[in-house]
Amino acid sequence: MRKRLEWRGIDCEVAAVRRDDPLADLSDVDVILIGGGGDNEQLYVCKHLMEYKNELRNYIEDNGSLIAICGGYQLLGNYYKLQNETIKGLEILDIYTETGNGRLIGDIILEADFLNEPHNLIVGFENHGGRTYIGSHTPFGKVLYGNGNSDNCGYDG
């Protein structure tokens, strides 16, 4: 993300939060990025973030920008069900994820209603074993090509 901002002439400062680091004051933060990882790492990160659940929720509800990919997205939901264990999520988004049969891997193209045509397409790559189901919020985009949150469900994010 830093490199893409630099390419566009946008200055940025990255503050990495590592395990056991306290969460900084979010009032001056422009964007939070939560990435992914393996199931064991997700469990550890979720336990750490649980301490800051209210701060993250308030940041988002105060129009803060948060990008969550892979397991980071799943952790924002109600729960993530593994084969033999259920990880309680942060309950910030009304979603839940369950382990599926096999991985969904390949290119994905989304149409995002919140972007203006002709620049409303998002192209990416998906590689996930979880199947995420959305409750009461609007998906990030409609799948034009690929799988999305679950097996050919028609939406992603």
Describe the function of each predicted region.
Residues 39-114:
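Cysteine-nucleophile active-site neighborhood
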Residues 18-20, 94-96, 126-128:
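Residues at the C-termini of beta-strands that transition into short coil/loop
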Residues 98-157:
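Amide-donor transfer/coupling interface in amidating biosynthetic enzymes
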Residues 15-17, 33, 67, 91, ...:
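Hydrophobic/aromatic beta-strand patches that form the interior of the parallel beta-sheet core
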Residues 33-35, 73-77, 125-132:
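Long, contiguous hydrophobic alpha-helical segments, chiefly transmembrane helices and signal peptides
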Residues 32-34, 64-68, 120:
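Short glycine- and Lys/Arg-enriched binding-loop motifs that mark or flank ligand-binding interfaces
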